[in-house]
Structures are given as C-alpha cells and as structure tokens.
Amino acid sequence: MTRVARYGKLVAQEGRGRELAELLLAAAARLEDEPGCELYLVNRQADAPDTVWVTELWRDQSALQAVLEQIKGSPETAAAMKLVAAAEMIELDHLGGKGPA
C-alpha cells in the first residue's frame, strides 16, 4: 500500500483564522480513532494568522476516500467551508522521515 500525504492551505475570511483552526482541531480529534489516518496536524501560519495549514498522512488512498465520503455534507464540514476564502490542496508521495515510518 502506498501512503497518501497532503498539505492543505486554507485561507480564512479576514479575522476568522482562529475560528477555522478551532473547527479543524475538532476534526482532528474526531480522527483519533480512524485507523486510516496516521497524521492530521493543524498549524497557523506565523506571519498570516488567517492562513491555516493542515498536514495529513493516510494509510492509503482508500482510507482517505472513506473519510472524505463520511464528512461530505456534514454540518462540521459546512461550518468550516463557510469560513474559507481560498483553499489549495497539495498531494504528495510520502517517502519517510521522522514520525510514522
């Protein structure tokens, strides 16, 4: 199986970065028991407080797709998306490093 890594860059509406980050941190907590999610980190850009980065690592593409299907149309997803002014998702090939091997 090939792990799937992603960086998500989410720019919140002006002044709403903290609120967006809190919703994403709640999403991270809900993923604690999701075996296919190996890493879900939420970070705020130091020089741009309305920009939130999410770093994800998934067991494989099917694990990612299963979670995306679960959250599609959920109230939590809708609430977060209302705060997003711009978004970019960067797909990566996980090679290794410190953390999950």
What are these regions (language model features)?
Residues A21-E22, I71:
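Short alpha-helix boundary/capping motifs
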Residues L31-L39, L57-E91:
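An amphipathic, aromatic/His-enriched active-site/gating alpha helix that lines ligand/cofactor pockets
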